Amino acid sequence: MKNLENKSFIIRCLKAAASPSGVCRYGNTFSWLQLSFLFLFLTACLMAPLAVSFVKMDRFSVSSFMPSAIQGVNDQFADQLQGFQIRNGKLTGGKSSERIEDGQNVMAVDMKHEYETSGENGRLKVTGFENAIIFQPDQLVITDQNETGFSVGYAKMDVKLEKPNVHDVEVLIDTLWLAQYKPMIMMLAYTVVSMIQLLLTFVLAGGLWITKISNMVSIASFKEAASIAICASALPAFAAAAIGMVHFDLITVLMIHSCGVTLMISFAFRYLTKTRRDNGNLHSGGNDDKSAVI
C-alpha cells in the first residue's frame, strides 16, 4: 500500500481508471480531498458536451413546454407582424394593430400596453385569457393554458419582419426566449447532471460498503467504497463525453455513463470477491500444511 501511495496523484488516477483491477488496487490510496477533486473533474467532463451544445444552440423549441400557445400562431397573425422590426431592444414600425381573439386565446401587437399581466415570470398570466402571444414595444408576452407564462425582452437583436410566415414567427419566438433564458436552462441542466452523478456515486458506494457486513469483499471503509465508485466512473465518463461531443443528446450521454459505471462496478466487485477467495484459499492451505508438519 505504501508503494502505491508513493506514486504521483496523476499516475494513480490513470491506473485506477484503466481497469477494474486498477480500481480495486488503487481504491484506498486517495484522500477525501483527492476524491472530491476527481468527482468534480468527472462531472465537468460530463458537462463539457452540454456546454458545447448550448454554445451552438441559437433557439429553443418553446412549443415543447407551451404547446397550446404556439399552436395558435397562424398566417393571419404572421401578416400582422409584417413591417415590424426589432432594433436595440425595441419593437418599432408596422401599421396593423388588429387583435385576434378567440375565446380564451389572443394574439396581438399591443403597442399601447392595453393588455394587463399578473403573476411572476414563469407563471405569468394575461388577464382574461389562457393562451396569449402579445408583442409589446419592449417585450413579448407569451402564456399557455398549462399555467406557464413568460415575458421575454428583445435583447439587442436586429430583426426585420418583411414577409413573415408561421414558421418565421415561431422561430422568432424560440430565438427570443432562448436569448433571455439560456443561462437558466444551462444551470438547470448542469444541476440535473450533478445530482445524477452524485446520487449514482452515493448509491454504488453505499452498496459496496454494505457488502462488508456479509464479508463478501474486503472493503475497509466507506472512503474506500466511495473511491471505487468514483474511479469506476472515470472511463464511462470519458466515453460518454467523447460521444456527446460528436452527437449530443443528454439522455444518451447519461445512459452511456450509467451503464458503463454499472459494468465497471460489476467487474470490480468480481475482482474483489475473486481476490478474497484466493486469499482465503492461501490461508487455508497454509494452515493445512502447518497441521501436517505438526
Curated annotation (Swiss-Prot):
Subcellular location: Cell membrane
Membrane disposition: Multi-pass membrane protein
InterPro entries: DUF1189 (IPR009574)
A cellular component annotation (GO) from this entry: plasma membrane
Chief location category: membrane
Pfam families named among the record's database cross-references: DUF1189
Keyword annotations from UniProtKB, A to Z: Cell membrane, Membrane, Transmembrane, Transmembrane helix
Function: Could have a role in maltodextrin utilization.
Protein name as it appears in the record: Putative maltodextrin utilization protein YvdJ
Organism (species): Bacillus subtilis (strain 168)
